[in-house]
Amino acid sequence: MFMFEKPHGMRDTLPGLYEAKKKVRSTLTDLIDKWGYQFMETPTLEFYETVGVQSAIEEQQLFKLLDQDGKTLVLRPDMTGPIARVAASKLHKHNHPLRAGYAASVYRAQEREGGRPAEFEQVGAELIGDGSTSADAEVIALAAGALKNAGLHRFKIAIGHAGLADELFVEVLGNAERADVLRRFLFEKNYVGYREHVKSLPLSSIDKSRLLALLELRGGKEICAKAEEIIGISGQSLIQELEDLWDILEDYGCAEHIRLDLNMVSHMSYYTGILFEVYAANVGFVIGSGGRYNNLLGHFGSPAPATGFGLRIDRLIEALGIQEETSEADAVIFSKEQRAQAILFAEEERARGRKVVLQDLAGIENIDHMTKSFANVTYFIGARKEEQNG
């Protein structure tokens, strides 16, 4: 029946999953907080002309609506834009970096046959006002630490650079339209299509080899030397940036979790430098991503370098293999005669840190069905008190 249906892509979070999400969220936010990032909240609704236009999410994925004044609003499609807006308008007035954290849901319309959620929660951090490679390393190390704190140890963070492929494409192709075609193949990870398209281009065998060699630039720091052989002079500084980043991440103790992927292309068009994606060993999709976006705050009238990341709670739960949390609550069931004693007992147990449901016997139709979901049950009925352990 229609009354039980939900809008496409929207999902209910029932108690077991809610508890699992709460536990994972807490492990992430606890570590981000310990690194000195201050948490903030932004409105679910933003103006389309500000956050909506500046978002890197495709237009057809935005949820739009009109307010009473006829202005177009959007449900926030990501958190980077809203935090950039806040930082530009209210917070970035000091001559030192700003560290902001968040835990919030974002909204992106999905195709009906895709089966993907249109609403999902992200936990993340943004470092605004620091353009150094150390800042890039900090947010990557923080993302790695947060994942470990959540209990995930088998993961990789693939690191690339938004400008590296572009440098090669512009030098070899000299045409933005041609470059966009190759960039799309990389974004879709359609490497077969990429190779076939490169072979069809009217280029010298040397230039074709350079474009094809880009696909092989994955691995440790050693691939930077290979990159220097195919990237032109203008791209050498980008390669040096990646080498410096690797050295800093080694100091953080993150080397085992990182690898370079120099043909990485992101769907987030505002990235201007280092970018990265997080993969878990047992799932086949990205569970988090981030990167540097030095131009975004300028669109809000306060230019500043920035970098950050977001981790998806739903995908992290799947990567962790967490089952829905079962209730750890106790139940206290009472009759009228011992109501006062039952209330006192329940309050004492709660003060000790237990979760306690207090239930009048008169409100229960099937006592066996109700009590089987509780860890322990204590009865205050008639003249007696009786305990039943789960």
Swiss-Prot record:
Its main location: cytoplasm. GO terms for biological process: histidyl-tRNA aminoacylation; L-histidine biosynthetic process. GO terms for cellular component: cytoplasm. Keywords: Amino-acid biosynthesis, Cytoplasm, Histidine biosynthesis. Disulfide bonds: none annotated. It holds the Pfam family HisZ-like. It is found in: Cytoplasm. Pathway: Amino-acid biosynthesis; L-histidine biosynthesis; L-histidine from 5-phospho-alpha-D-ribose 1-diphosphate: step 1/9. Gene3D superfamilies: 3.40.50.12590, Bira Bifunctional Protein, Domain 2. GO terms for molecular function: catalytic activity, acting on a protein; histidine-tRNA ligase activity; transferase activity. PANTHER family: HISTIDINE--TRNA LIGASE, MITOCHONDRIAL-RELATED, HISTIDYL-TRNA SYNTHETASE. Belongs to the class-II aminoacyl-tRNA synthetase family. HisZ subfamily. Heteromultimer composed of HisG and HisZ subunits. This function is generally fulfilled by the C-terminal part of HisG, which is missing in some bacteria such as this one. Required for the first step of histidine biosynthesis. May allow the feedback regulation of ATP phosphoribosyltransferase activity by histidine. This is ATP phosphoribosyltransferase regulatory subunit. It comes from Bacillus velezensis (strain DSM 23117 / BGSC 10A6 / LMG 26770 / FZB42). The gene is hisZ.
